[in-house]
Amino acid sequence: MKDFIGIYTNAVDPNLCDWIVKFIDQSCFVDVGENDFKETSWRQDKQVLLETFSPIEAKHLQNFVVECLKNYINECAPFISTYTYVSSLSLIQKTKPMQGYHAFHSENTNWQTCARTFAWMVYLNDVEEGGETEFLYQQKKIKPKKGTVVIWPGGFTHSHRGNSPMSDKYIATGWFQPDQGSLREHMFKIS
């Protein structure tokens, strides 16, 4: 893996993917662009923190992602395999056709996000046209396929964006950061 982008197909149980898609379709908690708290003109998607409303399913999802992180570290950087990481949330998103967040960005650009070592994403459905995750410097586009986990470094070297989907796109996303002792219930030892 020369580009440090780990792609793990069929890594998440398709039944869990279907459950999360149904969950977000039936929810009406946060709709970016219509919510006063997050109203923006540059982002249009529906977001829900899975842990808040369904902690059991969130834990199942995290377990699948952690297995992929173990593989990722063994492939890319085995010398950090003894480190302990936390992933404190699973943000699930629904993006309607031609909507989303299309600006290139990275995951650890300010003091609130600087500890994000790795980003992760799970595609919860297949998208036939558009909707790729595009990495700027790697010149790589990843097509959304249900159950696929993608893991990459959180820094500017892996600036990325979501391209406009032509049909509904569902993802779960989050971050791994080094353990600083405050989130023990979300700790994952990688060795």
What are the roles of these predicted feature ranges?
Residues 84, 111-114, 143:
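Extracellular/lumenal carbohydrate-interaction signature centered on repeated Trp-anchored short motifs
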Residues 92-95, 110-129, 176:
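Short, conserved beta-strand element in jelly-roll/cupin
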Residues 116, 129-191:
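Catalytic core of Fe(II)/2-oxoglutarate
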